[in-house]
Amino acid sequence: MSEESEKSFRPTILAPAGNKASFLAALAASADEIYCGLRQFSARMEARNFSIEELVPLTLLAHDKGVKVYVALNALLKPNDLNIAGELLQQLERRVKPDGIIIQDLGFVQLARQTGFSGELHFSTLSNVSFPAAIQKVKKSFGVHRVVLPRELNIDEIKAMATACPKGLGLEVFVHGALCYGVSGRCYWSSYFGGKSGLRGRCVQPCRRIYKQNEQKKRFFSCQDLSLDVLVKVLRTIPQIRTWKIEGRKKGPHTVFYTVKAYRILRDHGTDPKMKKEALHMLSYALGRSGTHYNFLPQRPQNPVRINNQTGSGLFVGAVKGTKQKPFLNPKEALLSGDLLRLGYEDELWHGTIRVGKYVPKGGRLFLKPILKKSPEKKIPVFLIDRQEKDLEDMVSKLEKELPKTPVFKSNASVFVARQPKTSGKKKGKILDLRVYRRIDKTKLHGTSGLWLSDQGVKKLPKRIWTRIWWWLPPVIWPDDEQKLKGLVDSVLSNGAKIFVLNAPWQTTLFTHLKEMNLWAGPFCNIANVLALKTLASLGYKGAIVIPELGQKDFLSLPKQSPLPLGIVLSGNWPLCISRALSNDLETETSFTSPKGESAWVKKFESDYWVFPNWKLDLSINRKALEKAGFRLFVHLLEPIPKKVKLKRRPGLWNWDLELL
């Protein structure tokens, strides 16, 4: 590509902002775009986030400097969230006028139309648009302007997605920041272990904890940060990649500033060895975890989980020495006055923070107060998590003085009420129990059966019964797997298959004659409100199995307003998460245990690793209430249990008795 054409395809750099100081730091670093969240419906509710009032002057200032602002509304919407979310969209449109919103829930597609939102629609990585044909589908069906690609893709897969990208749609690629262990949109770990949903921005990061397997106690699921650093030069040759995204809405202004500056240098001066060296120095100074290229280079993939590396948030600067009464630190990096240190990991109840009072040279001695009475006596890790530099503070302060004063907004007395879809009128139909297997033999062919679609599952199944099977597609389809899966779909279709359960809304693109099909949206579509159901109906779905992490009130309210017949996962083995990675030190099909005594195991299916708890989801005790509410399909997920795993008898109600947070 010529230098001139490279400039014309120059990607924008998208910076995170979880508070005002970080927003202004992104402006100071000359970010092209900034994304931030509100205090509701954001996938990073642990960040401070913004009110509408705070966002108005910040957005005006950004626009005045030619910087675009996108608001993340990428949380799962529950049944009673629709009116509030719609009102929020109206307020954004009237007062903030962001350049676009980032969403995962299909209900927001309908709300954007109903409220007349004029900005762009971006599909979050939580939407799991993960294979090339899906790219074309989301543009055609929803008119989205940008898709955020999964972090797990390698460069060849990214190129395949770009090749399929239609005109008018841009792709966004993560280049730097925290890596979740689970595939985005396919992790229920935090919710299953305590009711705080990652899909609603309240993940407590159970993947960062210490787990025990055999005699090892390690952080088997805690990933390093993704850092493409110098490899981003490869992305410059792909014009469909419009945006380089930096993760970090929970990070402070120091991290935001230096990370943005580093990637601007790598984008604009990536061929200059001295400038590359400066950029890498900035990244090392940005207070992140150790970095990994992960899958980016398919010929040299890196495992993101390295149990001997420190993976606490912040920059590891050493371990506490001395006695419990007289602890001290010899820092691996020089510490400045005002630096904020965290002692211990965030999941350890005894962890604490201290502010450095004066400069400490590299290798010097910082005396610590004996504040950690409940901590272990040895090897307490210390992380530098925030830094207050005068130069950066001055830049932020100067920008803060430029913030325009905004007039007091007189609220419109009208309240937004979401328009509900017409109900399906099929709530009194036949009730079905659907048992879903990995493989089916003759002994299992009683009642209605489902089968996960795979080579092994199809091989030994008599073709004469293929018409009776409910065929389940995987929760994730990677670019390399698309053609193989399409071949399997075509094979069973040619032998009379009619009923399919799709586990991402865009999987309809694998079928040609939708009207002849009985397609159901599966539970991994993460459907929890009637406007999302309305969107599914417009895509040709005949029914939907709702997300199983809801509480009793939400479950029972859905069928009465649904435009589609509804199903529910009544019992079975529901995964904590699905991942593309596995620690080299963790055995599959062998139990591991959390600090609280919860056990689980990992099993590989096709391209992915499924993490299962060692107790089943079981809502059977509430079946009558669910039938009365209008559910007509009751799903039982039956996984093969490894020999080394023993299931526990537990109630298995998940969030039934809780209100999902």
State each model region's role.
Residues S2-K137, V148-T243, K250-T535, L539-L661:
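Active-site pocket-lining/capping segments in soluble small-molecule metabolic enzymes
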Residues V144-H145:
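Long, basic N-terminal domains or extensions that often function
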